[in-house]
Amino acid sequence: KLGLGAMELEFVRSINITKEKAPEIKKVAEESNIILTCHAPYFINLNSLEKEKIKASIDRILNSARIANLCGAYSVCFHSGFYMGQDPKKVYDTIKNNMKVITSTLKKENNSIWIRPETTGKETQFGNVDEILQLSQELHNVMPCVDFAHFHARTNGKYNSYEEFAGILEKIEKKLGRKGLDEMHIHITGIAYGPKGEKNHLNLEESDLNYKELLKALKDFNVKGVAISESPNIEDDALLMRNIYRGLE
């Protein structure tokens, strides 16, 4: 009824859709012309020091991808893990190898949903833009989930100008080609942050995120794909951004 064109299935606490219910959701989404994405559970750490937690993390991503695919979803995003005080290069290799298990399993199952590690909001979390883009270059069916508020929070207030937003988009195109901008999964929200990064999400008008300049950059680069509002007032900010975007020349 709001006229919005996308929705994210939130599996952040648990995968709350059964495989029996999924086809019904797919049918409704198709009839309503809505693109679905999915956010896998928060309880994921592909760099855990405990093998059981790594296995559980892999299973959570796989099961999210399976249900999301049955729902007809476009992509599944997730927070990959934590550095755990280790060398980032070592962490990268560990997470990459565990993601290979995910991508090879889904390939065997003929599940072609996009697997999307997300840019994260804290320095302790794996997932700066270079790490996510490198994973996307090196792994089958992997593309970034680009959370612009997380860039802003992770750097304690940087990445908040047209030039900086454009720089991110230029980097994506340089690393992934035009496809990187044509197949985007984006999160936008207001955000509270401090020296350690993200604290919590805010409504856009209550935050300092320069979202109008971000929307202008997305328009100028002719970005395509899906943009998801993660503000507390999800629909209000989604409509706000849509209306501003449509008004851009």
What are these model-predicted stretches?
Residues 10-21, 45-48, 83-86, 122-127, ...:
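Acidic-and-aromatic substrate-binding clefts and catalytic sites of carbohydrate-active enzymes
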Residues 101-197:
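Acidic/histidine-rich catalytic cores of soluble enzymes
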